[in-house]
Amino acid sequence: MTGSIWAGSIWAIVPAAGRGTRFGGPLPKQYLQAGGQPLMAYTLMALAAHPALAGIVVAIAPDDADWPGWTAVQSKPVLTCLGGATRAASVLAGVLALPESVRADDFVLVHDAARPNLALADLDRLLEIGRGDPVGAILAAPVRDTLKRAGDDGGIDGTEPRERLWRALTPQLFRRHQLIRGLTEASAAGVDVTDEAMAMERMGLRPLLVEGAEDNFKVTTPADLARFEFELARRGIAVDADALEAPAVNAQSNARNVATQLATVSYGNDAT
């Protein structure tokens, strides 16, 4: 469906305000180098490769000195906004920073900044299936390993059935107004949702699971980075630096716009 009538109709949010403390080192993991480019370059290029993508909003940390200042990827606009202390806060900021042309019931993608190995076929399938559902869908992978439940003493308390268990991946696809309501309500309740589907679940909604490739992994450890570098070499992947345009959109200006929207947005009953 890459040549579908959806061309240029979907915006993506990339939360990139995290520090990646599990990885260690001075750089946030999304800026680690692989093949001569930051990891996030591959992430943005993978999204921009789909003709349905209209543009990307990247939520960055207020003190981010590493953001390369991209304003477009493959001629598709890249906007920035200031993210929050949690993933959910950054995603909400990104949703509120979307252009006015994005309507309340339009679908929006959310994708991890440090998940650079997204396949075009997976994104295509997610859009095809997710847009046919009133709620949306997420990429996910069936759990294949045997799962053990641990006791407080480190011993095994039991084995969990895996037949209906899936690992949540990204991108995740939901309507703009449902994202706003779900993330806002979770925050108000003091619940730190770890992905957007969890916010939907809290509202009683049931997103679809779309099976994605196992190699759509998130880079969280040095071993993950080495694995991605191996994939780059094996497949001969390179980023065309000319496809990444700068100077940067002013993040402080976007942040003021987000603050204004946070103060004035009305949620109503349109998110169910």
From Swiss-Prot:
Coiled-coil intervals, chain numbering: none
Record-linked PROSITE patterns: ISPD
GO biological process, one term: isopentenyl diphosphate biosynthetic process, methylerythritol 4-phosphate pathway
Site positions for Transition state stabilizer: 22, 29
Keyword Repeat tagged: no
Single Gene Ontology MF annotation: 2-C-methyl-D-erythritol 4-phosphate cytidylyltransferase activity
InterPro entries: IspD (IPR001228), IspD/TarI (IPR034683), IspD/TarI_cytidylyltransf_bact (IPR050088), ISPD_synthase_CS (IPR018294), Nucleotide-diphossugar_trans (IPR029044)
Pfam families xref list: IspD
UniProt keyword list: Isoprene biosynthesis, Nucleotidyltransferase, Transferase
CDD domains for the chain: CDP-ME_synthetase
UniProt pathway: Isoprenoid biosynthesis; isopentenyl diphosphate biosynthesis via DXP pathway; isopentenyl diphosphate from 1-deoxy-D-xylulose 5-phosphate: step 2/6
Residues the UniProt record annotates as site (Positions MEP for the nucleophilic attack): 162, 218
Reaction equation(s) it catalyzes: 2-C-methyl-D-erythritol 4-phosphate + CTP + H(+) = 4-CDP-2-C-methyl-D-erythritol + diphosphate
E.C. no: 2.7.7.60
Recorded family membership: Belongs to the IspD/TarI cytidylyltransferase family. IspD subfamily.
Main function: Catalyzes the formation of 4-diphosphocytidyl-2-C-methyl-D-erythritol from CTP and 2-C-methyl-D-erythritol 4-phosphate (MEP).
Protein's recorded name: 2-C-methyl-D-erythritol 4-phosphate cytidylyltransferase
Organism whose genome encodes this protein: Xanthomonas oryzae pv. oryzae (strain KACC10331 / KXO85)
Lineage, highest ranks first: Bacteria, Pseudomonadati, Pseudomonadota, Gammaproteobacteria, Lysobacterales
